[in-house]
């Protein structure tokens, strides 16, 4: 019995070793888009849906959307995980946490991810891709929080920065895309082959 116990302990991985992910792939990491977004309701007061809808695209990529009953623009946000850091892209349209609990929601997702992957992240970066109200509304909820960096006025050193953000083996390319804002940015994630355009590109209606 003692020998079996010793073998079990010796085989237990150290924190942060088990979930180390190789973010280099020949093809895009698969993701799940089989779900439906909340459509809001005629009466915002009577709406009983969650304030922020969270969808797990894959094990290291999450999509968040603000409830249309809370704000008519219903902006999207994205939470990306690497082996050392996490990145929240955009911060929604509402400042008040009682109506739009962005920090609380993101913290819960991060906690579950850390527990599942046996990793304690070094830092969480919040990066709006522009300065529109629908991108920066919830920024204040993250200010002054330990291990959180808010990059509200992030300036690109060059037009295309291929080493702009390294989340721990998941390296994102940042592209300057001025349009609605002079400091507009787009992020390309080679691991998922997703281009996060924020307000710089919308499908026509």
Predicted regions and their residues:
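Boundary at the C-terminal end of the N-terminal hydrophobic targeting segment
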Residues: 16-19
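Active-site HxH/HxHxD metal-binding segment of metal-dependent hydrolases
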Residues: 24-28, 94-173
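Core dinuclear metal-dependent hydrolase active-site scaffold
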Residues: 159-189, 194-195
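Catalytic metal-binding/acid-base residues of hydrolase active sites
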Residues: 132-134, 178-182, 201
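Sec-dependent N-terminal signal peptides
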Residues: 3-12
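Short Pro/Gly-enriched beta-strand edge/turn motifs at strand-loop
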Residues: 35, 57-64, 167-170
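Cap/insert and terminal regions of metallo-dependent hydrolase folds
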Residues: 204-205
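Conserved beta-strand hairpin/beta-sheet module of binuclear metal-dependent hydrolase folds
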Residues: 51-115, 186-200
């Amino acid at each position: 019995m003692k020998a079996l116990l010793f073998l079990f302990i010796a085989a237990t991985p150290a924190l942060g070793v088990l979930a180390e992910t190789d973010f280099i792939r020949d093809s895009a990491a698969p993701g799940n888009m089989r779900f439906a977004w909340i459509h809001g309701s005629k009466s915002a007061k009577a709406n009983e849906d969650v304030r922020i809808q969270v969808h797990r695209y894959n094990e290291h990529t999450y999509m968040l959307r603000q409830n249309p009953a809370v704000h008519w623009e219903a902006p999207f946000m994205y939470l990306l995980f690497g082996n050392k850091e996490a990145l929240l892209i955009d911060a929604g349209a509402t400042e008040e946490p009682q109506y739009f609990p962005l920090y609380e929601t993101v913290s819960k997702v991060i906690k579950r991810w850390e527990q599942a992957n046996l990793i304690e992240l070094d830092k969480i970066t919040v990066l709006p891709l522009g300065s529109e109200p629908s991108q920066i509304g919830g920024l204040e909820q993250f200010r002054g929080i330990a291990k959180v960096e808010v990059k509200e006025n992030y300036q690109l050193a060059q037009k295309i920065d291929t080493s702009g953000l390294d989340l721990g083996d998941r390296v994102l390319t940042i592209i300057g895309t001025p349009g609605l804002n002079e400091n507009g940015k787009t992020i390309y994630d080679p691991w998922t082959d997703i281009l996060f355009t924020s307000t710089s590109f919308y499908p026509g209606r």
